[in-house]
Every structure is written in C-alpha cells, then in structure tokens.
Amino acid sequence: MEDQDLRERIRKLVHEEHELFQQEAQGAATYAMRERMREVEEYLDQCWDLLRQRRAKRIAGLDPESASVRDVETVEHYDQ
C-alpha cells in the first residue's frame, strides 16, 4: 500500500469517526455504532502506526513495503 493510499484511508476513517462521535454527542448512538466507533479508533491506530513505520524505514534507507500492520494490543499501548 502506498503512503497516499494509507493517508486516504485514514482521512475516510477520521470522517467516519467524527460522524459517529456526533451521533454519540446527540444521544442517538446505538450499541452497534459504539462498537463501530471502537473498531474505527483501533483501525486508525493501526493505520497511523503503519504510516510511521513506512516513514521510518524510508528514512533509514530500507524498503517501506516491508512495514506491516501490528496488532491492536501493540499499537494501543504506545505513548504518543
């Protein structure tokens, strides 16, 4: 996946997350919406992590394509 594709995926997920937050703020969120919000947050963490990995590999002169998606438990516990 190219960085541009990854950034586009992040943009779409952020948009979806904002829509879900709006539903939550209005008291209109269902259980399924809250569950989806959790999934989107986790997936965003993974996407941002992958983008950072790709960037770091490129800077180090390595192949950014060798970066891989890490599990949710790993990326959720990073200090940012």
Model-based region annotation:
Residues 1-80:
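Extended, charge-rich alpha-helical interface modules
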